[in-house]
């Protein structure tokens, strides 16, 4: 929960996911640079990996942390036709959660095509996403974190990104903020 808007943060998390899936940043630059390249993209010719399109419809999103922000993200994902599963330390009850399948964390890790983190930084969650947890994730998973940077062990994330275990990560937080120099995660 935030002072400046639970919906705003969930929308930002969804925007990170949409940019990963549809490379809006790359395509926007390409459109500005060359009409011919735009035609090649639209015709599906020579589509490089960095602008590969990923369809979200019928994919499974796993939400870690089903508080106000996590619930907003779940609703948005459902609006895109995604199957929504979630893990929360304490099971959530009430009609607003009926569309969410609440599962144990290990099950979420093995089933989710996208994992979006929306839990607070606590003794239990600090360093929670490490190489052991990443190993339980589906190959090629997309990871979104708009919660707290210290929930993910950055060196383990870098290794998983480099190996392809994690296809891409959308982050607006890192372990040590503010960033004062180049960090391996940016490479």
Walk through the language-model features, giving the residues of each.
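Residues at the starts of beta-strands that form the adenosine-phosphate
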Residues: 60, 74, 79-83
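Glycine-rich Rossmann-fold phosphate-binding loop(s) that bind the pyrophosphate
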Residues: 66-67
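Rossmann-like adenosine-cofactor binding region
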Residues: 89-184
